[in-house]
Amino acid sequence: MKRLLTATILAALAFAATAQTPKNVQYSFTEATELNLIGKLMDTPNPYHRVDTCRFKGFTKGENDQVRCSAGLAVLFRTNSSTISVKSEFGYMNHGENTMGIALRGYDLYIKDADGKWVYAASKADGRNRGNCVLIKDMDRSEKECMLYLPIYSEEYSVQIGVEEGATIEALESPFRHRVAIFGSSFTQGISVSRAGMSYPMQFMRNTGIQLLSLGCSGNCKLQPYFADVLIAADVDAMIFDAFSNPSAQMIKERLFPFIEKIQAAKPDIPLIFMQTIYRESRNFCKSSDSFEQAKQEMAATLMEEAVKKYDNVYFIQTNASDPSKDTSVDGTRPSDWGYMYWAKSIEKPVLKILRKHGLK
């Protein structure tokens, strides 16, 4: 009897440790909203939208599409499945040429290792409505803590996580702390990354444990008052701005102070951290690009020197998304994953220092 019990236990352990997903595996699906969906500025009728465009008005058609996309959102869950898949129902889908389809329309899976570090596990896109997109197979059946990044430039009506029938799946409590809004350009949305988890806000989150709530809108972060309305309505502890990448020098001059004053009138006590825009590598030889970008940077620097003195709790920090060879760009404007890594690292110390000053550790 004792031998039989031992054999049964060993067989069960062997099954749990096996790294072979059955060829005829059947999947059981759970809606992501039944797990832990993180990265949202606020609740929305469609939980995969970032902004409720029925509530907030003033957006252009393109901006409406962008704020309904899921950039910066991720699902946290725990499972012992040997395989993980995703079944999606899509609305708008972007097919831009300067960004991998996996980033625009696909999913990016990270799993915590034994040291508690988030490690890349799988990424894939197939763009089919209701199709079962199998991200990974043949994992062991130990319990795993997972973080699945949603597409950066697609709208979803449903996102269902698939695990093999009989496996467990449940919500994972978020290890990320605080609620820090980040409003910005294509850089902040993650354009030109290879996969969703490689945008600089997502790299910053994994590196620091600080939760960033992304409102990145490619080409459309121009200090507009209606975006300020969204940020004011959000329950956040701090705000970070990639505010000088899209507007011209003249637009920065006209809009910066009214934008700051509008937000500060509603949220006077939270830190507002403005980042200088990065060096765009199109400037290496193109004189017109160099002149236009230099004018923006100089205007931002001049006005922010005044702003940090004029307004309480307003800060200005420098950024870097290039290496000494100036060779980290994908299209002359947006950095590659490598460039975004530099960006995330360049802001880590100053942002953490400012947050600590305001009791956000």
Model-identified regions with their sequence ranges:
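Substrate-gating cap/lid alpha-helix
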Residues: 280-318, 361
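Histidine-centered active-site loop/cap adjacent to the catalytic His
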Residues: 330-361
